[in-house]
Amino acid sequence: YAANPYFYMVDTAGNQLPYIDYQDERYINDNEMRILKLVNGEAEYKAQSLNLESVPQLMDGAEKGNYSVDVVPGITAGAFSFNVTAEDLEKRKVFNDIRFRQAMSLAINRAEINDVVFYGMGKAQQYVAFSPVPDFVDPKWLNYMIKYDQAKANSLLDAVGMADRDGDGFRKLPNGDALALNINFATQGIGVGEVELVARSWNEVGIKTNFKE
């Protein structure tokens, strides 16, 4: 990226913005390789696509890589959604059933995710407008169905008609077909630790869940 020499904004001292004339951004999809290059001092600046769970490793390598790590407040959240237009009509029916989505939300142990992935520094809420929340967002949606409750999640899944019909520990679709959720994600948007814990929570209520970066 090259700075626009005709950019109209200036700072309070009258200096034209932006301060940086040129930026060369390299795309590295693999998170481990991305962190390794940072630890080896192969970048001058990086903010995007860094997850809090990588901070300990980055801190350990700061002296070797001759860099500093600044942990600042951020507005980031992992969001999980279901394909409500799935070609499989039975899956589509289940994914469009609000009771199923409520169950999946209640099955997530957000307190554990906060402790393990965000070191207790996060705040659980639904995926609505971030703080400070605009006035048009009803506060009730912030905490809608976020309290960890496996019993209620199981009850809702029972009501949807999903049951373990063959004793393998996993629920089937109402018509008896097998169901397996496949979470496809990129570490540029969410840490693998968060995805792993969500997948485990869903498996615990009988919804077979796999994940792949």
Regions found by a protein language model. Give the residues of each.
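Extracytoplasmic/periplasmic ligand-capture domains
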Residues: 2-119, 123, 128, 133-213
